[in-house]
Amino acid sequence: MTEESEETVLYIEHRYVCSECNQLYGSLEEVLVHQNSHVPQQHFELVGVADPGVTVATEATSGTGLYQTLIQESQYQCLECGQLLLSPSQLLEHQELHLKMMAPQEAVPAEPPPKVPPLSSSTIHYECVDCKALFASQEMWLSHRQTHLRATPNKAPAPVVLGSPVVLGPPVGQARVAVEHSYRKAEEGGEGAAVPSVAAATEMVTEVELLLYKCSECSQLFQMPADFLEHQATHFPAPVPEAEEPATQQETLVPSPTEAAVSQPDPLPASDHSYELRNELRNGEAMGRDRRGRKPRRSSSGESGATQELFCSACDQIFLSPHQLQQHLRSHREGVFKCPLCSRVFPSPSSLDQHLGDHSSESHFLCVDCGLAFGTEALLLAHRRAHTPNPLHSCPCGKTFVNLTKFLYHRRTHGAGGVPLPTTPVPPEEPAISFPEPAPAETGELEAPELPVSEESSAEPAAPGTYRCLLCSREFSKALQLTRHQRFVHRLERRHKCSICGKMFKKKSHVRNHLRTHTGERPFPCPDCSKPFNSPANLARHRLTHTGERPYRCGDCGKAFTQSSTLRQHRLVHAQHFPYRCQECGVRFHRPYRLLMHRYHHTGEYPYKCRECPRSFLLRRLLEVHQLVVHAGRQPHRCPSCGAAFPSSLRLREHRCAAAAAQAPRRFECGTCGKKVGSAARLQAHEAAHAAAGPGEVLAKEPPAPRAARATRTPVAPSPTALGGTTSAAPAAPARRRGLECSECKKLFSTETSLQVHRRIHTGERPYPCPDCGKAFRQSTHLKDHRRLHTGERPFACEVCGKAFAISMRLAEHRRIHTGERPYSCPDCGKSYRSFSNLWKHRKTHQQQHQAAVRQQLAEAEAAVGLAVMETAVEALPLVEAIEIYPLAEADGVQISG
């Protein structure tokens, strides 16, 4: 197979990865040759009973009864039957023969081998090959062997001696899990101490089994891929099958003699390790096992092709594989072992120790799709291919594989008696996502936001063979990946608990990153500013501040964000969705932490308290600045643009100053009124204001209207006839965004929060009292500025003259003294001012003059009206003499006729 590469020169895609060390290769031959380096040559020496520690070479003419057997291994070996092959092509052809064996062949009962005397009739002790220490159980021996593995990780493999467990260390430079060996005690076959023959020794050596499949979740080892796949299914939630007809009472309660023999627990513990030596004879009779050492499964219906089930004699629990039954029986005999960090349960202390090593290991490579962390980049690259819609090796059942060998072994599980292949991929059911119920508005508790389902994802069908998430429109190649994505991303399942503070998380990697907050460990420094972080994800988000990249952009206003979660929260503003309401003042927020920060202003007690004085602060930065200035007597680092103080230069470099952004040159110009703004988002918001005000109004160039006129002005949509066209010929006007209108003064606002703050002007509400003097304010920022009057803090200093101010706005007004800028001009007389407050005071003089002029005009008008009445009465006297006045008969009235 030739190496396939992309059209680009810089990137070459490797299609094959080694399952042991995760190295990437471009052809199958290279990875097969490389995998041969992971299989060490193993020497099995059969030692006599009298002196098990002595090794004697075999001689053809000797009659001592000691033998030495050497197992040779070829370059290419079938992992299923152990046959040796000479080339990769022969290995592939041989594996295809296994695929064609769809129907299981009936095993021909072999002749019973000659009786082999036991190796030892006494109790077996487990001996360590390094320090010669003896142990009474496998668990104690395994725990002891872990100390040697951690001390000497690159030790060369030692010879395996029958009768004593041996641990083979990994080769130098290979990051592999050590392959452990253990042996089961041989059964007593009869009396006598005859030395086994060469044929018997050879047959015993051929019974050594290699367990090549290791579970990544619990580190258990398996020989057959079917047992490995069945075990892996226990770690993932399987779909609930339809209700089947219950078995008859006879099948459930009356087991057959064969079933009773199978359901009994083994007298010896099952081996979990890579090699297992079994004596197949018991008192001259073969045990009920096949040629590979597997127990025969019990059929629930009596037919060979039916579903096979195994029952536990202690609790009547049903299992689908002998390995599951053996693990369950071990839990009855030895109990279970629980992890103190993640509450997972393991059947043996060795698997628990290996799992605890996963908690302490570092994972530097994070998958951006599912959040899983990996120790090497090769593992991450191999994992990333599972997220692609068209993986390298895809099975019709929905599973994908990167390694061709594992894919071929998986295909055999769909043979006769296995899992049938689906004719068409079954689309996943709509996930039942549960969110916490929102609290009533009057309780003041947090209300959970409802995530809107995208109309595009529901209307647009997914590609054939893929599964699409209905909430975020992402596509997956397997239903299992979609289920995992919905569980970790959209569902609020938090099953992993921190053992220190009790906080719950969705993934174990999140717990590991969270534990570093307790230990203070920050192993991921930024290469630009050297700031350390406790997780690679936080480091990746931080590096966006240096590059200036904002990959997540809002489609409504064009504003860009560094995180997708921030964009989702921002879109709630456009949707006018504010689910979090304050019980005290009724202000609503679209983020829960903003409501939490808002509540501190009502209580007056802030979360960050100083240990040396009774003061408290809303932000940790303010507390650090306070401790630096007041208690340490040092000057903080200040931003030259806005004057904000920071405890360190690193925090100052991270600061993104809004004042500096406002002083930057404005490059975006409005096509309607010519106004220039500093960003595309502000330009779109400004153009939206034009659309809300109507096409006939100009916002920026016309002088500001009087306050009464601005308060009563409302946008009026012009009719088609007023624009000079007919209703049929005029094009459809674009949908305009209407702002939020105040019911009292008809003033328009762009956000709900601005409207809520404005309404306090009409209601007179001031929900933010000062804890020092009791003065109340309408906004929390006004209270924060006011409290500096009590503390005497003036954090905003002028860089020209050194004068300090308590409010940043006062500093901005003061800078105009040095620059001579007067941006606020009066529309009536043209006089300009440095601050808006001075302009407002000046406008009051015009209003007073205008009111005085109006009063004078009214007085003059009243005087003119009175004079005109008097003059009219004098001139009418001659006319009154000619008027006849006579009484009415029906009513007391006067009728004048001339």
UniProtKB/Swiss-Prot annotation:
Disulphide-bonded residues: none
Ranges annotated as biased composition (Low complexity): 707-734
Protein family (similarity comment): Belongs to the krueppel C2H2-type zinc-finger protein family.
Modified residues (Phosphothreonine): T726
Any Pfam family: zf-C2H2
This protein's name: Zinc finger protein 574
Entry function: May be involved in transcriptional regulation.
Source species: Rattus norvegicus
Gene: Znf574
SUPFAM superfamilies named in the record: beta-beta-alpha zinc fingers
PANTHER family registered for this protein in UniProt: C2H2-TYPE DOMAIN-CONTAINING PROTEIN, KRAB AND ZINC FINGER DOMAIN-CONTAINING
GO CC annotation: nucleus
